[in-house]
Amino acid sequence: MLTNSPFMKTFFGVDLSASPKKKSAYAVLYEDLTCVTGFFKHDDELVEKVEEYSPEAVGIDAPLSFPQKGYYRLCEKALRRLGIRAFSPLFEGMRSLTLRAIQLRSELEKRGYEVIEIYPGGTQDMLGLPRKNKSREKLYLGLRRLGLRFPESRDGDLLDAVTAALTVFAYKKEEYILVSSSDGCRLVLASPSLKEALLQIKG
């Protein structure tokens, strides 16, 4: 059973679905690398969880803006140059996800929380972890090897939520890569240097 100090800083990650009819996953990462995970459907449920844990920031796995022109944002093009596959917010099924994420960010920011756009698949690429569609088992084991302690689960959405929380941790510990573009897109990935920082925490 995982136990946590109420005085530790927390970092909140969200693997958001496009519709509240489907479950979404969240993860709360503590400074000692223990992690609490769970599911929600409606935005107000997530807002309650965020207020319960009062995180340093919230990372949402979804676009938080639309392209100003064309099909892709400039940050998606930058990711492709890094060899990271990413979808346009205008891709089928992504538009409703993006609208939901933008609304959720607004609700959280009104309550004083910092919200950042993150991309678990990109962070997994940066850290040498397989994506969930390649091997959920290897992704699970890879996150555990980094020192993260979370309830045993091979659920792909939960693993992405844990990766999202880890990306927020990296952002606050200044072990991150910012993909920023003139069209207003700001997307955060964990830097490969995060591995060394995590080893120091593991001791």
Predicted regions and their residues:
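Phosphate- and other anionic-substrate recognition elements at nucleic-acid/protein interfaces
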Residues: 2-203
